[in-house]
Amino acid sequence: MTQAEKGDAENGKEKGGEKEKEQRGVKRPIVPALVPESLQEQIQSNFIVVIHPGSTTLRIGRATDTLPASIPHVIARRHKQQGQPLYKDNWLLREGLNKPESNEQRQNGLKMVDQAIWSKKMSNGTRRIPVSPEQARSYNKQMRPAILDHCSGNKWTNTSHHPEFLVGEEALYVNPLDCYNIHWPIRRGQLNIHPGPGGSLTAVLADIEVIWSHAIQKYLEIPLKDLKYYRCILLIPDIYNKQHVKELVNMILMKMGFSGIVVHQESVCATFGSGLSSTCIVDVGDQKTSVCCVEDGVSHRNTRLCLAYGGSDVSRCFYWLMQRAGFPYRECQLTNKMDCLLLQHLKETFCHLDQDISGLQDHEFQIRHPDSPALLYQFRLGDEKLQAPMALFYPATFGIVGQKMTTLQHRSQGDPEDPHDEHYLLATQSKQEQSAKATADRKSASKPIGFEGDLRGQSSDLPERLHAQEVDLGSSQGDCLMAGNESEEALTALMSRKTAISLFEGKALGLDKAILHSIDCCSSDDTKKKMYSSILVVGGGLMFHKAQEFLQHRILNKMPPSFRRIIENVDVITRPKDMDPRLIAWKGGAVLACLDTTQELWIYQREWQRFGVRMLRERAAFVW
């Protein structure tokens, strides 16, 4: 037999063997993809949109983008009828500023700030010489603006074609005389539900849908009809409202038309974006500051707290301090959008946390409002530039009275669509389990409550017990759970815990105390040690010169002595990998899109349509 004949015979045998395997049901080997795996992953990531919605700024982009598009998270809606009263959501102004006690609280807070400034020595070993506002006021009151140009170069948004809505920068630059309402759909990290026009849940969701759809079309150049080919990664706050998250997911999948979604927490995404596995995340935003401890991709529930102040409060405080020093731009109004933009710019330009910068300094700034001449102002400032950012550590300086300033992680209100929510599980527990829980409640209530103290030691265990056991029980539910005196005792214990929580949440914790409290709520000393060794600051609210050294000094001085002895270094990171701290969380969302484990987290449109909120309980990477 020739070589050619032998080859033909072998080929024939191979083909026969393949046919035999097919008949037996043996799977054929998968044909290797024509596109290399790395390129496939890139193509897949290019069809994932990462959305990080903030109170003031929306960050949105493809997972493959180096940087996201950042636009003001605001919408202007045209009036349906002429003559309607204008409605504008406030930016720098907020509830609780004009109470009778506000000014006294502001002054007391400023005294604490001044005491802290004086007590810390400069790097040369001497103490700072305080500068009173009177020293700058006499000079500033004489200052008059110089006209740089009769045209500022900025213009109001053209509304001659009567658009139904305007988004982002265009909404900010709508002429106040035009018939448009201004809405910021997210306030202090939550949906901006309020009793005024456009304040219902439906209206807020409609505003968000319009803003996000506009951004996707304009900045990502994706036609809305093509969103069925795209998937979305949505970043949510660590302390989230389940109802709001459910509605946002429904909007993204069913109304905007994305094919799938992954929902994840900002803090965990910040660790992905920074490349750190375990760290205490301090997210200082424009309107809220959130603190929590993240370990190996898990945000510890008991360590989460949200403070109802941020960068915009520092801007408003800086304006108040400049007014005391005779701020020469006397027409400045906190109700004017252009003036709010100016004050934000002045804060970012002049404020710092450097103890070595002291005495009076000369500064200048320009005002370029639309349809107005360009003006140049010169003025002097002293300690005001340091006092304003220090208000983050002494929030009484903000002068906010009668508002809930600290939020802990609470048990949710329950969802009728979710058959496994906590309320349902509690209602179906056996009598034995309920009795055991009641006994545990009484024991925990008998222990002293330490919220009034320094928020350390035994007191830190209380929020953990509260979160684990806090239930909203009516009298009828209480009677069902246990009989007679047991029911009364349990309700008394519950009320005492709720009183402790309300007292704690009424206080405005300083940033350093909030960090210490969060770390102190960790379950083990090893975890606490990890968190003290790595504190990551993200967001744009603490982007001041020398903020890293300042925060590090505050934490070192206030941390428990037992940890001070064993921790070699408290590492405060404000710019991981030299990245903009405002973009870290978004970048982490983009990293999440590329992880292999993320494949298990996707919730697809058909699944959501069929199972609804149950998919979040099944697929979310955190405890829903």
Curated annotation (Swiss-Prot):
Pfam families, per the entry: Actin (PF00022)
Region of interest (Disordered), residue spans: 1-29, 430-460
PTM annotation (Phosphoserine): residues: 132, 412
Basic and acidic residues biased stretches: 1-25
UniProt keyword Zinc, yes or no: no
Cellular component per GO, a single term: centrosome
GO molecular function, one term: ATP binding
Keyword annotations from UniProtKB, A to Z: Acetylation, ATP-binding, Cell cycle, Cell division, Chromosome, DNA damage, DNA recombination, DNA repair, Mitosis, Nucleotide-binding, Nucleus, Phosphoprotein, Transcription, Transcription regulation
Primary site of residence: nucleus
Compartmental location: Nucleus; Chromosome
Record GO biological process: cell division; chromatin remodeling; DNA recombination; DNA repair; positive regulation of DNA repair; positive regulation of DNA-templated transcription; positive regulation of telomere maintenance in response to DNA damage; regulation of cell cycle
Gene3D superfamilies for this protein: 2.30.36.90, 3.30.420.40, Actin, Chain A, domain 4
Transmembrane helix keyword on record: no
N-acetylmethionine PTM positions: 1
UniProt-annotated binding residues for ATP: 55-56, 283-286
Position of the signal peptide: none
Xref: SMART domains: ACTIN
Family named by the database record: Belongs to the actin family. ARP8 subfamily.
Quaternary state and interactors: Component of the chromatin remodeling INO80 complex; specifically part of a complex module associated with the DBINO domain of INO80. Exists as monomers and dimers, but the dimer is most probably the biologically relevant form required for stable interactions with histones that exploits the twofold symmetry of the nucleosome core.
Task performed by this protein: Plays an important role in the functional organization of mitotic chromosomes. Exhibits low basal ATPase activity, and unable to polymerize.
Protein name, UniProt field: Actin-related protein 8
Organism field: Ailuropoda melanoleuca (Giant panda)
